[in-house]
Amino acid sequence: MALMILPFIGSVSVSESLVALTAVCLVYLILKFFRTEIPAGLRQLPGPKPLPIIGNVLEVGSKPHLSLTAMSKRYGDVFQIQIGMRPVVVLSGSETVRQALIKQGDEFSGRPDLYSFTFINDGKSLAFSTDQAGVCGACRKLAYSALRSFSTLDGTTPEYSCMLEEHICKEGECLINQLNTVMKADGSFDPFRHIVVSVANVICGMCFGRRYDHNDQDLLRLVNLSDEFGQVAGSGNPADFINILRFLPSTTMKKFMTINADFNTFVKKIVGEHYATFDKNNIRDITDSLIDHCEDRKLDENCNVQMSDEKIVGIVNDLFGAGFDTVSTALSWSVMYLVAYPDIQERLFQEIKDNVGLDRTPLLSDRSKVPYLEAFILELFRHSSFLPFTIPHCSAKDTSLNGYFIPKDTCVFINQWQINRDPELWKDPSSFNPDRFLSCNGTEVNKQEGEKVMVFGMGKRRCIGEVIARNEVYRGLAILIQRLQFHEMPGELLDMTPEYGLTMKHKRCHLRATMRARNEQ
């Protein structure tokens, strides 16, 4: 998941701005006389001086990952900005973020009570919930248990180590055939268009136990809903920062609510079908696994939290949304990097050919045989940093970090992009170099270096689907490299400039792909 509340410049109409200005001017004039009392021995947070009403939005601009990184060079790893009327603490630097999210995890594991969060999964989202213990904590335990159970389910044939691998492998074959067909018909393909549908099918298989044709209207509707969610959420919601705007008509907010309601309706229907056909002795997918783990509506004998059907819908919704957008964006960027660095693409192919072969698809058990591919994925995560921020955190109580006082209920941004491009952490961070993650002899991945990359957050709010996402990216990419060779279009320059949003995606483009011969030398 990524930061969904910056930037919002340009998303406020003139009428909204005028009403907000009138309504909050008095509030601002009153509040500016009140300053948070700093406990003895602690310092006040540094940061740029905010303007009335709008705060620091002009300085943040349309590329917050870059502007906030630049601010960290001036103010340090812990500083404060103001978005609208809301103070926001920005954390940068690997050690500072690790201190906050792991060593002081209980103090920074909250979520801010942003207005838009209440409409995601009807306010029952694991990822966006302000409840860090209680029901939310119980739901996270349930989700982890269900994911573990699903990931160990046997495939339908001995060829696959688990059902997850079977879903990824079969859909990978379908994607290869689809791209081959499109290339023969059109001579080029849009990588994001086809990858996103393929990934959606894998997630549908894992969550719902069903696969759709690539042109199926239900599947395309899901893809479009996810895309619309990213566009609307990525543009930000001013009502999250200027409270009076919550009570004013907003076409953007109305669309956001409709998107979430439509997706919830879709998931509720499928969960209802699963309840009607549930068989404890035949667990078909993650939804079945969730139902199995809470048939009695309790997680365990010592837990008094009742687990409703709505909570299961919320968990499935979260798993689908997070896994779908993250994996599809990662694989789409992967293809772009393969085209941008043809020598690296060829080296990856040779590694797979030499250590796995070309007569079968790469399996999860082959990962240790292809360390350069693993290093490529890590460098992809680091260099693209397509998840520039985690979902915003919130201080659960009055606390301090690096000697600075942070009041309770302060919104906290975690700048993953800065960590992944920090010159104090990485040699020549702007260059794309998978070898930085290999051991001296190049035969294995340097785990210590790999752990520096930040993409799924860390601590108590770390992405619950991280393991499945990493496996899916590895398997999907391995199949693509083994079977296809990717090229840029003749006469066209490849544009690797990311577009800021919920996740940072590359600009839509067309590429070429040719099938590799099974006996290729």
From Swiss-Prot:
Positions that bind substrate: 229
Compartment annotation: Endoplasmic reticulum membrane; Microsome membrane
EC annotation from Swiss-Prot or TrEMBL: 1.14.14.1
GO terms assigned for molecular function: heme binding; iron ion binding; steroid 17-alpha-monooxygenase activity
One of the protein's GO biological processes: hormone biosynthetic process
Uppermost EC category: oxidoreductase
Keyword Metal-binding applies: yes
Cofactor(s) for this UniProt protein: heme
Keyword Acetylation: no
GO CC term, one of those recorded: endoplasmic reticulum membrane
A matching Pfam family: p450
This protein's UniProt keywords: Endoplasmic reticulum, Heme, Iron, Membrane, Metal-binding, Microsome, Monooxygenase, Oxidoreductase
Binding site for heme: 463
Domain of life: Eukaryota
Catalytic activity, as annotated: an organic molecule + reduced [NADPH--hemoprotein reductase] + O2 = an alcohol + oxidized [NADPH--hemoprotein reductase] + H2O + H(+)
Membrane protein topology class: Peripheral membrane protein
Protein function: Cytochromes P450 are a group of heme-thiolate monooxygenases. They oxidize a variety of structurally unrelated compounds, including steroids, fatty acids, and xenobiotics.
Family that this chain belongs to: Belongs to the cytochrome P450 family.
Name recorded for this polypeptide: Cytochrome P450 1A1
Organism: Chaetodon capistratus (Four-eye butterflyfish)
Classification lineage: Eukaryota, Metazoa, Chordata, Craniata, Vertebrata
Originating gene: cyp1a1
